[in-house]
A protein has these predicted regions:
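A feature for loop-to-transmembrane-helix boundaries and adjacent hydrophobic helices
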Residues: 1-254
């Protein structure tokens, strides 16, 4: 068993706290940008537009992630404490909400620049596992999105939460949604799937949703929501919708 007693604050600059969660976003975005610019983008026009697109992506991701968490997972709390919606540094981001925000931002940017939005969404899909990996590691450090009770040798006790031994579900997600997904999509990139805009995006939705759905069986449901239809979590139900969306999109791109 591992004892998790990490401090969510990485360090301080004067009186300003720099949290691991913030660093995860910064590192994930920076490495994703570098990966796209150095390895993925072959078209000169897209290369020139990509830096401006990143601004749209960041805004869409943060707004979508926060509003998604507010609406999907904790609406009553934030209606009672609306000012806390702005306190992103305290955690509380929905991946599915962030994804919706990124899709909207990509569509708006592409319309403005007269390009195919799937070109940018495919690049996001290929680089997103990098950010997901660091984000889940930050979740682990923050003792959030923790797993269900277990007696397995690699169980973790999140002492900031309780004294129960739990699955390190954040690390499961970092491995499958981060590392494995990165190499799976990289394989399809080498097969020239970028040639058909939207194919990589569809595959991302399919594989991410599969990984997320099954890992949710090891992750504790949000206490304010619990289990829903067929004893599934909200994350699983949303993953089913995203999987179906990805499968439908892939069928259109064949």
């Amino acid at each position: 068993m591992f004892i998790n007693n990490f401090d969510p604050v990485a360090f301080q600059i004067f009186s300003i706290e720099i949290r691991w969660y913030s660093l995860a976003y910064i590192i994930g975005i920076a490495l994703g940008w570098l990966y796209c610019k150095k390895k993925l983008i072959k078209d000169t026009h897209i290369f020139q537009l990509f830096d401006d697109f990143i601004t749209y992506l960041i805004i869409g991701m943060i707004l979508g992630g926060r509003l998604g968490y507010t609406l999907f997972y904790n609406l009553k709390y934030y209606l009672d404490n609306p000012i806390e919606i702005l306190m992103v540094w305290n955690g509380g981001m929905s991946f599915h909400g962030a994804l919706i925000g990124i899709i909207i931002a990509s569509i708006l940017f592409s319309k403005k620049n007269n390009t195919n939005s799937f070109i940018f969404l495919d690049l996001v899909a290929l680089s997103a596992p990098i950010g997901i990996f660091f984000g889940r590691i930050a979740n682990f450090i923050n003792s959030e999105l923790y797993g269900r009770a277990t007696d397995l040798p690699w169980s973790v006790q999140f002492v900031l939460i309780d004294n129960i031994k739990r699955h390190p579900s954040q690390l499961y997600e970092a491995f499958f949604e981060g590392i494995i997904l990165f190499f799976v999509l990289g394989y399809f990139f080498k097969k020239d799937y970028l040639r058909v805009p939207g194919k990589i995006s569809a595959l991302f939705l399919i594989f991410y949703s599969l990984f997320r759905f099954f890992i949710e069986f090891f992750r504790s449901p949000d206490p304010q929501i619990g289990y829903l239809v067929l004893n599934l979590t909200l994350g699983q139900l949303i993953s089913i919708l995203f999987f179906m969306t990805g499968a439908y999109l892939l069928s259109l791109k064949k």
